[in-house]
Amino acid sequence: MQRRILLAGSAAGLFAPAVLRAQERTVSIYSARHYDSDKQIHEAFTQASGIRIRIIEAGADQLIERIRAEGANSPADIFLTVDASRLARAMEAGITQPYASAVIDSRIPEGLREPGGHWFAASRRARVLMYDKAKGAPAGLVRYEDLANDRYKGQITVRSSGNGYNVALASSFLAANGAEATEAWARGIAANLARPPAGGDRDQIRAMMAGQGAIAVSNTYYLGLMSISQQIEERELAQRVGVIFPNQGDRGTHVNISGAALVKTSPHPAEARAFLEFLTTPAAQRIFALGNMEFPAATEAETHPFLLALGDFRQESPDGQKLLANAPEALRLMQRAGWR
């Protein structure tokens, strides 16, 4: 009941009898997320509000350029994407606008909101270190920095340096430690690889569990998806994987977020605001968590039992501007260090 009251309050005027023409009330979302769980959120929003959703899907950079090219005539109301740096890029491109919402502020922690109100996180994925429970956690593995220690020579499976998740992690590392330390760290990882980088995060987990190395670098999201796979072998394998949340004694574990922004030229700002607030409701957060195996962004939101069992962790606050600014240098340093 409370959720419906909050939603109605956030979209004041949308439900007045004079404008109850559902076919004319729409919100256009330009989304770089392509998940069935998102469709469930859209359907739940339409059912609760009567507002229809129009979706344009493409890569984040493509959508940013499209909105910029469309200019004042863009039909886009909301930009939705993965990665804080992409949200920062949209902001830098001048296609977003700040907005204030007491509802969002009360549900989403400050560290997951852009300080100027341009965007907020709707869900999270932690970039963690994984190991085979049967073999135990590798001794001394506590921080991302430890991956460069030569005691782990031939033990690491990780995606290529050009992968967006790794660029974001290295950008975060660069912000914390500087260029010299970042290059040395990347060189250490390259020297410690169990095999040349190949495949996605799930491939790193599978390779590690098959005996190729002892440490897999992966997002929790992928392990979570393996735990609910239709293939029993995948589900059983996921249960045998242990997780280390790095850097709990200092800056916290790096997280990738999915977030949303209100487009500067939104033709339906009231409807857009209603949807943005809906993303933070228990109903929507539950779909992110249970349907797509992501950590919810809202405080006190439900988390999938599999992810909950991994334990609490301190996270690094995602600074989209720093991640965006550091990305080119971070990639250059990784590649120069031999991390292919």
Task: Annotate each PLM feature.
Residues 5-22:
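N-terminal export signals
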Residues 22-88:
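Early extracytoplasmic/lumenal segment of secretory-pathway proteins
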Residues 74-79, 97-129, 133, 145, ...:
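A structural signal for short loop-to-beta-strand junctions that line the ligand-binding cleft
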Residues 87-95, 114-142, 170-174, 255-261:
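Periplasmic solute-binding protein
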Residues 135-142, 174-182, 266-272:
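Short helix-loop capping/hinge motifs at secondary-structure junctions, enriched
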Residues 161, 165-168, 172, 177-246:
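Ligand-binding pocket segment of bilobal, Venus flytrap-like solute-binding proteins
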Residues 258-318:
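Mature extracytoplasmic/periplasmic domains
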Residues 305-340:
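Extracellular/periplasmic bilobal clamshell ligand-binding domains
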